[in-house]
């Protein structure tokens, strides 16, 4: 059955791969990005029809509210929500600027809280499924990523708690925690050295994370779970 899937951070990386896979499955996509042109261009490139690209900065509540007002008026009921918008500002804690800390927390944690709040209101009458994007760093921690790790660890606790709150309304909430994936965030890493820490011996691809997300979105008896998609990286951290 075709459903309306709302994908934040859908114009690149994991979010783009998720949008493409969901469209291939026959779902209608509302794709959101801070860059309106990128959102619209990506939406137009997806298989199928009637996809929509909108601009939204998830760290700003008024923009999230405006986006969902548009979705509610023009698209109807939301079946799936994917929270793939995220940033990092990696640095040792003593070298981290407070404005960077706030930017990471507001985008990675508060942003997903705001989008979930708006989506749940839409889903209350008919149910739905939400997948948040965390990180293996949120599970295990990593030197030089204290703030990013905190934002993703907080998202895990939020995901489990929200799953408990809305299960009675047939709304499922899960989280995918990727490891090292070929995206803009990992473009500057020394890949040859990094893969030595991964049991499967390679970086993952956005499409592989998208497959895990699709599994959670379409699995009717799974909620409150954290699914690591990391090639076994957590085994050696």
Swiss-Prot record:
GO terms for molecular function: 3-oxoacyl-[acyl-carrier-protein] reductase (NADPH) activity; oxidoreductase activity, acting on the CH-OH group of donors, NAD or NADP as acceptor; quinone binding. Substrate binds at residue 135. The active site is at 148 (proton acceptor). Homotetramer (in vitro). Heterotetramer with HSD17B8; contains two molecules each of HSD17B8 and CBR4. NADP(+) binds at residues 11-14, 34-35, 57, 84-86, 148, 152, 181-183. InterPro entries: NAD(P)-bd_dom_sf (IPR036291), Sc_DH/Rdtase_CS (IPR020904), SDR_fam (IPR002347). It comes from Danio rerio (Zebrafish). Its EC number is 1.-.-.-, 1.1.1.-. This is Carbonyl reductase family member 4. Keywords: Fatty acid biosynthesis, Fatty acid metabolism, Lipid biosynthesis, Lipid metabolism, Mitochondrion, NAD, NADP, Oxidoreductase. The gene is cbr4. It is an enzyme of class 1 (oxidoreductase). Pathway: Lipid metabolism; fatty acid biosynthesis. It is found in: Mitochondrion matrix. The heterotetramer with HSD17B8 has NADH-dependent 3-ketoacyl-acyl carrier protein reductase activity, and thereby plays a role in mitochondrial fatty acid biosynthesis. Within the heterotetramer, HSD17B8 binds NADH; CBR4 binds NADPD. The homotetramer has NADPH-dependent quinone reductase activity. Both homotetramer and the heterotetramer have broad in vitro substrate specificity and can reduce 9,10-phenanthrenequinone, 1,4-benzoquinone and various other o-quinones and p-quinones. Belongs to the short-chain dehydrogenases/reductases (SDR) family. Pfam families: adh_short_C2.
């Amino acid at each position: 059955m075709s459903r309306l899937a709302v994908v934040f951070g859908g114009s690149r990386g994991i979010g783009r791969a998720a949008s493409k896979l969901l469209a291939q499955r026959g779902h209608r996509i509302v794709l959101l990005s801070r860059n309106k042109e990128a959102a619209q261009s990506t939406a137009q490139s997806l298989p199928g029809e009637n996809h929509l690209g909108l601009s939204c900065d998830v760290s700003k509540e008024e923009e999230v509210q405006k986006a969902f007002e548009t979705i509610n008026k023009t698209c109807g009921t939301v079946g799936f929500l994917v929270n793939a918008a995220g940033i990092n500002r990696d640095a040792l804690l003593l070298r981290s600027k407070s404005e960077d800390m706030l930017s990471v927390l507001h985008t990675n944690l508060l942003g997903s809280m705001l989008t979930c709040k708006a989506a749940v209101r839409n889903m209350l009458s008919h149910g739905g499924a939400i997948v948040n994007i965390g990180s293996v760093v949120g599970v295990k921690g990593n030197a030089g990523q204290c703030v990013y790790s905190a934002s993703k660890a907080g998202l895990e606790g939020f995901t489990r708690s929200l799953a408990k709150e809305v299960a009675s309304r047939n709304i499922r909430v899960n989280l995918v925690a990727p490891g090292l994936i070929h995206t803009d965030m990992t473009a500057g890493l020394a890949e040859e050295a990094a893969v030595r820490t991964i049991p499967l011996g390679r970086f993952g691809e956005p499409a592989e994370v998208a497959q895990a997300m699709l599994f959670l979105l379409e699995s009717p008896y799974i909620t409150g779970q954290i699914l690591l998609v990391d090639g076994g990286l957590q085994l050696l951290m």
